[in-house]
A protein has these predicted regions:
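Short flexible linkers and secondary-structure junctions
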Residues: 31-148, 152-163, 167-170, 184, ...
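Amphipathic alpha-helical coiled-coil segments
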Residues: 49-66, 127, 134, 138-159, ...
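Bacterial Sec-pathway N-terminal export signals of envelope proteins
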Residues: 28-78, 83, 106-107, 115, ...
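Hydrophobic/aromatic residues within transmembrane alpha-helices of membrane transport systems
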Residues: 42, 103, 149, 215, ...
């Protein structure tokens, strides 16, 4: 039996422990994700959504103190201490000298306190609207990334099938070269087509990698995979137009208008006086006796025309501007929806044309040219071009299908319900 030194044993154990720790530290992939799973995972894990939720929680916490009274004030002092004359420096010779302690409390007028509460509630509304807007953005970007990844991988598989189909063509060329019915230069044409397919594949691989990176950003999965079927989303123009006013962008603007209106109320509340009450106790030499004082201070907004009224007018103008901005945002959303619906209808028509006409024609032509080449009636270059044309038609059909899916996702998430 071999005995290892204690130091060597410790090094071995440390090495094993480090290996196990590194194994546990590897992030676990969520595995293949369906469309719905990806959107739900992003809604749960996106840091930007957590940041918006924290901002909303902060606004709610801040609102608790919005309409409360300010903290009381403790006043400490020494009054009427002689610094010259026969009593200079003495605390007891002058009956006016005293040490004082007092408390004061400010009472803002009720209109101001209510306006502050309304302002805090409006701040909560802005935070909540921001959370809704960010949630919709996260869901939209996640959904589009999943669609791009799904169709990008399908297009890659289509190109792989085309590349594999060239093997049969290569065998035909080899046989014709052996029989002397083909020129030696024609043996290079399948390789040229493979090179063209490789270029297309490299471009599509970059698209897939970019989509996977975008999906990883929102889901937190370091290597997301798209699985399942693409979403089947119903685009209902009537329902979408009817729900325009409930969209997060308009709700956010409504919250900003509420803030401006609360500022108007605050400006108007400044025309009402605030109160301050104070109590002071004065400690003097026992031979004179102690003293107490009670006082009330009242603000006098006597010059409203030069102070409060201009601020009120400015706040009202900002609120009115917010209402105009809301109408501008609404019109922009309506125009964007109409434009997106028009694009969707166009992409649907193009997809239908590709499926029903372009791809079947390209396939039939490729079959005819392949048979003609096999019969010696067509040169290899023409046969390869029609084969490449079929591949391009099939990839283009996938492109058009992806356009339709992207349209449906963008329209339903941007203008539709809050949840997919």
């Amino acid at each position: 039996m071999i005995m290892m030194p204690g130091r060597a044993v410790r090094r071995l154990l440390l090495s094993i422990g480090a290996t196990l720790a590194s194994a546990w530290a590897v992030p676990v992939s969520a595995g293949p994700l369906t469309y719905e799973q990806a959107v739900r995972l992003a809604a749960a894990n996106a840091p930007s959504l957590k940041a918006r939720a924290a901002a909303t929680a902060g606004a709610r916490s801040s609102a608790v103190a919005a309409d409360r009274l300010p903290d009381p004030t403790l006043d400490l002092g020494l009054q009427n201490f002689p610094v010259s004359g026969p009593n200079a420096g003495s605390f007891t010779r002058d009956d006016f000298t005293m040490a004082t302690i007092g408390f004061s409390q400010t009472f803002p007028n009720l209109a101001k306190r209510h306006a502050r509460a309304a302002r805090a509630a409006a701040d909560i509304g802005i935070a909540e609207a921001g959370e809704l807007v960010e949630g919709r953005n996260v869901r939209l970007e996640t959904a589009l990334a999943w669609v791009d990844l799904y169709y990008g991988e399908r297009r890659l598989r289509q190109l792989d099938l085309l590349d594999a189909s060239l093997d049969d063509l290569q065998k035909t060329v080899t046989a014709r070269l052996a029989s002397g019915s083909a020129r030696p230069s024609q043996a290079l044409e399948p390789d040229q087509l493979r090179a063209a397919i490789a270029d297309r594949r490299a471009e599509m691989a970059a698209v897939v990698a970019q989509a996977r990176a975008r999906l990883a950003r929102y889901t937190g999965d370091p290597d997301p995979q798209a699985t399942g079927d693409p979403p089947m989303l119903d685009v209902d123009p009537i329902r979408l137009r009817a729900g325009i006013d409930a969209l997060p962008a308009l709700r956010a603007q409504d919250a900003r208008i509420a803030v401006a209106e609360a500022d108007v109320r605050l400006a108007r509340a400044d025309k009402r006086p605030d109160w301050k009450v104070g109590v002071t106790y004065g400690r003097r030499d026992p031979m004179y006796g102690d003293m107490a004082s009670v006082g009330v201070s009242i603000d006098l907004p006597l010059f409203a025309g030069k102070r409060q009224n201009p601020r009120i007018a400015a706040s009202e103008s900002l609120a009115q501007g917010g209402r105009f901005d809301r109408e501008a945002i609404r019109r922009e959303l309506v125009a964007q929806l109409d434009a997106d619906l028009a694009d969707h209808a166009m992409h649907l028509s193009r997809l239908r044309n590709a499926r029903e006409t372009l791809v079947p024609l390209a396939r039939h032509r490729a079959e005819l040219d392949r048979d003609s080449y096999g019969a010696g009636k067509l040169d290899l270059g023409a046969a390869l071009l029609t084969t490449l044309g079929l591949a391009e038609a099939e990839v283009e059909a996938l492109n058009r299908e992806a356009d339709v899916a992207r349209d449906a996702v963008r329209i339903t998430i941007t203008y539709g319900e809050e949840r997919p």
